[in-house]
């Protein structure tokens, strides 16, 4: 059939050449000044003329700050990004240490195992490897896998196909010795076997409250020489500091400072700086904040490459290899299935950030050890889905070129470099750990984070926001008792709220706060919807009455069995009925009375209401203080 028969005139083919389509081409180009004026209009709407904000003041109000002082502005522009983006796989490695070639296995799905039951762990390891796991992370400790059981738990593993990494919180030497011994007994050629010993004597000392001993590093590196060049003796574990409360800047800076000190130590022990770089890996944290995680991984590679340049390391050896592990500090005990979402975001962030291996913690990590394969399956499948279905692994540095991510990478790198230099002035990371420097930085971060958690500027879904009393949990095995440590204390972010919940569940009947909802649902619905979840954070039940006379409200209060009440309504109803109901509830025996709203909404009765009412519920309130004091009033033991 001819082209004419098919309906296409050969003379018209020139009209089919592709053209660039500009989606915004029909609109006038907006200047930055016009954008700024529009921002001013929005933020000044309703403000009196004498209180109008300038653009700089508007920007300040819209800017947020991380716990360690990184500014995040509402909009980034071309001038905020570097002029040259660079390329993945080449110095300074900001965009990736390696080049992803389109294969789906762009990173190792590295499964964590720490169950001391060697038979359970052996079976779990085999099931994981048969179902998508590509490498292993084993905790070898008195409360985890015993060194003498390592041979058994790895007995089904094809060591020539599976990299194994160990780490320990109590005896790194014993863990390393146990792993090397397993590999030395293998009948496979040593050069085909890759293993990571997970040594980090500085982080170990910080965790245990002891003095770092770097003198053994060289011996371990030499012992690994017979194995695959992919083997590593050192894993700088920034996760140790993250779990103790470090922000992104400190976690990054202290990893760099630790690495620099290890390079110096290994050079003194007879290695070149390039050989030292070859034996160092990083373990970094992936959190619920995807952009900070992506930027931190990128910034670490860039800064580590700069350190390599100073040490004279071969350019192609300066890339930082990173094992990202999802944040233990982010994991919650209440409503644990929400942790699957947190783990998904963190794993996504690590993959976009260019981690070579990713460990997704089981969503039960705050409850106990997995009782069966289900939590382990969800953890490994998170990475597999992202790699094989979402296809992130087919893309090199997908966040590269983003004005926001590029600017955030630069901000983190600059701030971390400044802290790195402070540590260097102290004499290195060993000195920083042994002095008060690390604890002072951690105390500042933890204090700021505690404020944000308490006022919910840093909300925790299903815990401090949208809590569900009696949410479905999952059966786990209890964690074995761990030996005491004298070093850095670890705390999950949700612990402060879980302590409140524990107080409520420790009594035979849940404590109650009566919601006195005045007027119609149109009047009280918004306040009731805000206040009820606040009380539920601590596991406090909220019986309520919807409208009615003062006498009916008091009668409902008495029947509820509550000893504390919370007024919920609109300004209009507060002005009409609020004071009367407040007085009646106090007369009926309310030990404490709260107001959802503002005292000024009582109109002429505002001053009297403020004297009568014990506290308020409002956006930005310290929910931890209010809930704790309410439980005190109700006589619930701490």
Curated annotation (Swiss-Prot):
The record's EC number reads 5.4.99.2
Q: Where is this region: Disordered?
A: 1-34
Q: Which UniProt keywords apply?
A: Cobalamin, Cobalt, Isomerase
Q: Which domain of life does the UniProt lineage start with?
A: Bacteria
Pfam families, sorted = MM_CoA_mutase
Assembly and partners are described as: Heterodimer of an alpha and a beta chain.
Its annotated function is as follows: Catalyzes the isomerization of succinyl-CoA to methylmalonyl-CoA during synthesis of propionate from tricarboxylic acid-cycle intermediates.
Task: Write the protein's name.
Answer: Methylmalonyl-CoA mutase small subunit
* Protein's organism: Propionibacterium freudenreichii subsp. shermanii
Q: Which gene encodes it?
A: mutA
């Amino acid at each position: 059939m001819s082209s004419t028969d098919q309906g296409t005139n050969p003379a018209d083919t020139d009209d089919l050449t592709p053209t660039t389509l500009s989606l915004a081409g029909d609109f006038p180009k907006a200047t930055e000044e016009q954008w700024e004026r529009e921002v001013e209009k929005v933020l000044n709407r309703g403000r009196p003329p004498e209180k109008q904000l300038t653009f700089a003041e508007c920007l300040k109000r819209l800017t947020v700050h991380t716990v360690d002082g990184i500014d995040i502005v509402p909009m980034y522009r071309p001038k905020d990004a570097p002029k040259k983006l660079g390329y993945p796989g080449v110095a300074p490695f900001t965009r990736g240490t390696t080049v992803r070639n389109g294969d789906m296995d762009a990173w190792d799905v590295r499964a964590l195992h720490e169950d001391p039951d060697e038979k359970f762990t052996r079976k779990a390891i085999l099931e994981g490897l048969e179902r998508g796991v590509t490498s292993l992370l084993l905790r070898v400790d008195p409360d985890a896998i015993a060194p003498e059981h390592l041979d058994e738990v790895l007995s089904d593993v094809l060591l020539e196909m599976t990299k194994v990494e160990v780490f320990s919180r109590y005896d790194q030497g014993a863990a390393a010795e146990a792993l090397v011994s397993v590999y030395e007994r293998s009948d496979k050629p040593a050069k085909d076997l890759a293993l990571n010993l997970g040594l980090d004597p500085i982080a170990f000392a910080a965790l245990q409250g002891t003095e770092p001993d770097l003198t053994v590093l060289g011996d371990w590196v030499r012992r690994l020489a017979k194995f695959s060049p992919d083997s590593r003796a050192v894993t700088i574990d920034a996760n140790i500091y993250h779990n103790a409360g470090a922000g992104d800047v400190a976690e990054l800076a202290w990893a760099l400072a630790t690495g620099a000190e290890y390079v110096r130590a290994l050079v003194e022990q007879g290695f070149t700086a390039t050989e030292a770089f070859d034996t160092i890996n990083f373990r970094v944290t992936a959190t619920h904040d995807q952009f900070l995680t992506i930027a931190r991984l990128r910034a670490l590679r860039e800064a580590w490459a700069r350190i390599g340049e100073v040490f004279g390391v071969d350019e192609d050896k300066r890339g930082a290899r990173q094992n990202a592990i999802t944040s233990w500090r982010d994991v919650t005990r209440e409503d644990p299935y929400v942790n699957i979402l947190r783990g998904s975001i963190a794993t996504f962030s690590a993959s976009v950030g260019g981690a070579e291996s990713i460990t997704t913690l089981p969503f039960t990590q705050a409850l106990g050890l997995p009782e069966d394969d289900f939590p382990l399956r969800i953890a490994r499948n998170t990475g597999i889905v992202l790699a094989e279905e979402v296809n992130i692994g087919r893309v090199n540095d997908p966040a590269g070129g983003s004005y926001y991510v590029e600017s955030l990478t630069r901000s983190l790198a600059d701030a971390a470099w400044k802290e790195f230099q402070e540590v260097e002035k102290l004499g290195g990371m060993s000195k920083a750990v042994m002095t008060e420097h690390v604890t002072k930085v951690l105390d500042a971060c933890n204090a700021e984070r505690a404020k944000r958690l308490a006022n919910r500027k840093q909300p925790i879904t299903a815990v401090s926001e949208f809590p569900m009393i009696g949410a479905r949990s999952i059966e786990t095995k209890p964690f074995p008792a761990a030996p005491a440590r004298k070093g850095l204390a670890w705390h999950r972010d949700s612990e402060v709220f879980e302590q409140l919940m524990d107080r409520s569940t420790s009594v035979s009947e849940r404590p109650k706060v009566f919601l006195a909802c005045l007027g119609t649902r149109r009047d009280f619905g918004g306040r009731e919807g805000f206040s009820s979840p606040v009380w539920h954070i601590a596991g406090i039940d909220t019986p309520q009455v919807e409208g009615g006379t003062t006498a009916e409200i008091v009668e409902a209060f008495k029947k509820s069995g509550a000893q504390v009440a919370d007024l919920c309504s609109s300004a209009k109803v507060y002005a009409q009925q609020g004071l009367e109901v407040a007085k009646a509830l106090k007369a009926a025996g309310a030990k404490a009375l709260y107001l959802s709203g503002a005292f000024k909404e009582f109109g002429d009765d505002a001053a009297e209401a403020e004297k009568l009412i014990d506290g308020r519920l409002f956006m930005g309130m310290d929910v931890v203080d209010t809930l704790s004091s309410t439980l005190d009033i109700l006589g619930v033991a701490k």
